[in-house]
């Protein structure tokens, strides 16, 4: 088996949903394949030097599947946990294939991942997680009225938002640990993992939600004792006064400093919270920035690096 530094701790890389499907692009399979090819090139550069575990977003994809389900009148729409599992399989397959092509001889494994949430989490009463395509205000208002969706602003447009409870426990963690120890590059916890609760009989049961993939990545990185966490998105770092004339990028900062500011709940906010949690609990670093600058972020030459 060809793998780098098997005795060192991994870097956990979280790919934003926009790294897989850029804003404004139609959610077609060939377009996503092309974007995943680009993402795999960036991940492979890191994986040649470090052990790597990859997670990814699924917001556009799970939203598309939900829309398709709404259009099929012959059966009830599939619940969000099932749709999340479908996207985890699809995106994981495409990522694994591209990574195997980029890293000949390297074991690459995709693992469906269930993550326990609290059924009493207040997030179930206040949806914040954007999924699906971007709409104009007029389109969003019409869909909210027709389908009973919760809608919120996201960038220059509007998207459907769903419940996003806190990730508490990763069911497949022991298996992930074994795979990492073996030297495999693991793709797991895609889309934040499949949200489940423990029922009265002590078994697992899926719930209607989408876990934030950055918070899930932080929990995964903490549990794996990762040497670092890399949150990759379509902006080049964390900004104070974003989208104003006074915007300023934090190049190197601390959780204490970042917690002084407010960031958008559906986009940069979870990334900052994930970074702070990981750094505070482990004493390791977290980088936030653009996919094509991933190696430079690790080297402290790009993006925002959060340190203890």
Curated annotation (Swiss-Prot):
One of the GO BP terms on file: arginine metabolic process
Location of the protein in the cell: Cytoplasm
EC number in record: 2.7.2.2
Gene Ontology cellular component annotations, sorted alphabetically: cytosol
Keywords attached to this entry: ATP-binding, Cytoplasm, Kinase, Nucleotide-binding, Transferase
Top EC class of this enzyme: transferase
Keyword Kinase: yes
Gene Ontology molecular functions: ATP binding; carbamate kinase activity; glutamate 5-kinase activity
Reactions this protein catalyses: hydrogencarbonate + NH4(+) + ATP = carbamoyl phosphate + ADP + H2O + H(+)
Pfam families recorded: AA_kinase
Family to which the UniProt record says this protein belongs: Belongs to the carbamate kinase family.
Protein name, per record: Carbamate kinase
Species in which this protein is naturally found: Synechocystis sp. (strain ATCC 27184 / PCC 6803 / Kazusa)
Primary gene name: arcC
């Amino acid at each position: 088996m060809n793998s780098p530094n098997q005795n060192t701790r991994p870097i956990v890389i979280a790919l934003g949903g926009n790294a897989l499907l850029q804003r404004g692009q139609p959610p077609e399979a060939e377009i996503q394949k092309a974007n995943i090819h680009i993402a795999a090139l960036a991940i492979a550069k890191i994986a040649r030097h470090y052990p790597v575990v990859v997670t990814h977003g699924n917001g556009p994809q799970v939203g598309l599947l939900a829309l398709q389900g709404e259009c099929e009148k012959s059966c009830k729409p599939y619940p969000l946990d099932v749709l999340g599992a479908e996207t985890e399989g699809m995106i994981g397959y495409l990522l694994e294939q591209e990574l195997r092509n980029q890293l000949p001889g390297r074991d690459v494994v995709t693992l469906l991942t269930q993550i326990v949430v609290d059924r009493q989490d207040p997030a179930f009463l206040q949806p914040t997680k954007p999924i699906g395509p971007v709409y104009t205000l007029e389109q969003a208002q019409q869909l909210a009225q027709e389908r009973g969706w919760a809608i919120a602003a996201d960038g220059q447009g509007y998207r459907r938002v769903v419940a996003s409870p806190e990730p508490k426990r990763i069911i497949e963690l022991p298996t992930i640990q074994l795979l990492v120890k073996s030297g495999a590059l693991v793709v797991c916890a895609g889309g934040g993992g499949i949200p489940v609760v423990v029922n009265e009989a002590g078994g697992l049961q899926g719930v209607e939600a989408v876990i934030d993939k950055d918070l899930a990545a932080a929990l995964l990185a903490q549990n794996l004792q990762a040497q670092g966490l890399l949150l990759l998105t379509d902006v080049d770092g964390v900004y104070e006064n974003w989208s104003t004339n006074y915007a300023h990028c934090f190049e190197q900062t601390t959780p204490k400093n970042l917690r002084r500011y407010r960031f958008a709940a559906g986009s940069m906010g979870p990334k900052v919270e994930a970074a702070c949690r990981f750094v505070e609990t482990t004493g390791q670093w977290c980088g936030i920035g653009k996919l094509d600058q991933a190696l430079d972020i690790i080297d402290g030459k790009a993006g925002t690096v959060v340190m203890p």
